[in-house]
Amino acid sequence: MMEPRYQEIPSSESPTVEQDGVWVRVIAGECMGITSSIDTKIPITLIHVKMKPESRLVQQLQADLNGMIYVFGGGINLENETRVKKSPIAFGIGAKQGIQDGELALLSEGEEIVIKSQEGAEFLIFAGPELNEPIERYGPFVMNTKEEIHQAFSDYQNGTFVN
């Protein structure tokens, strides 16, 4: 199990960049030539994106990471052959897939996604490795077993949860 750790990173310290109608805040990972300021123990990506109408973003993702996009304003199209693995939303698989406000797209393996917005959009891009291990959660804790959950609560209550 990974040792627990915490980083206090105010949003003012998360780098942002804007060009060609696309604004991004890089919380974790890299986008448009800027890299986040946080130290991650595993390769993850978390990018907040705002796109003006008729803008386009090309984002690289590590091929071995699971990627997803959550749109919470406007809509976007995936312009290349990025495919959706599974999705609770109704749209087909293939090029020029539309993702609208409130929808989540889980992306297939690939190293590049091309995103275009006709109307303007706001969304998050996430990517990270597949865990391939059991997940147990309760309250603010996520562990592998109920025993680990109980230990986490005990450590928290005893003041030994974080060094």
Report each predicted region and the residues it spans:
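Jelly-roll (double-stranded beta-helix
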Residues: 1-163
